[in-house]
Amino acid sequence: MVYGLVAALGWGVSAVAAMNAARRAGTYLAVLCAQGLGVVLLVLLALLLRPSFAGVGAGVALSLVGAGLLGLLGYLAFYRALEYGGAVGLVSAISATYGGVTTVLAVAVLGEHLGVLGTIGVVLAVAGIALAAARPTAGGDSSGAGSASGGSSVAIGEPIVGVAPAPSRIRALSRAGVPLAIICALAYGFGGFLLGKYSPQAGWLAAALVAHGASVTVMVMAFPLLRRRMAWRGTTSGVIWAGAAGLTDAVGLLAFSQGGAAGQVAVTAAVSSVYPVIPLVGGVLLFSEHLTRRQLIGVVGIIAGLVLIGLG
């Protein structure tokens, strides 16, 4: 249970830090810094533990590279959703359903068994996404961030990845990143499936190094193409927040891995699944975000579904 709590805390804090990073430094710089720090930590672990790469053949390596690129797509979609003004609690809850995507793929492709609790969890998570993503009816659910409050709602006016654009007022803050959050969940889910399928053969550390190394390599290769279009002024704090997001995300991943190694997979997965509660509370307290009743019910359904998937 302790590993699950540490993982939940790490991933929850990482989501809050990611929002600050995305809105201060832009998506590209934020993801590059966060992913780069993650690779540095993995390299340090590799130097300490000296894992074997004997299981990383050509086919396995290509699959892990694919997992890394899918993960990169997920990160870009997640940070972009936050940069566009999506509510961090809502975006985090929807993107967290990637576990359900991976579970369904494991059942459909690998023939793994999904219990009753897991099945109910998948249904709850999908229903929660439908509620959270639905447009509010005219005159209903008007308690959202962009309708009555009109306070600190922020949107993005410059649609260039990596650019830190000027803020502008929007009408519905909490729905701005929903489509991107769904893309994030799908990318994470498919990437996680590939990573989970080939990690036993390659070893978890070797697999993580190949996957994360591929994503950072692509980001570095894209740097010359985007350099002239980036807004470098005022991004120092954003880079610091991105580093914090990468560090806390790595803490969550390591805690989750340790929980699995200790034979506490179900408990660790179930407890860590509640991590969207942290960005949800953080969004309300730190950023004055307010979800509509329908969206809040959807988020609760998503979290409940994730817990059941972890137990199932």
Q: PLM features: what roles do these ranges have?
A:
Residues M1-L9, A17-A18, R23-Y28, C33-G66, ...:
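Membrane-interface interhelical linkers
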Residues G26-T27, G86-A87, L110-G115, G203-W204, ...:
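A helix-boundary/kink motif common to multi-pass secondary transporters
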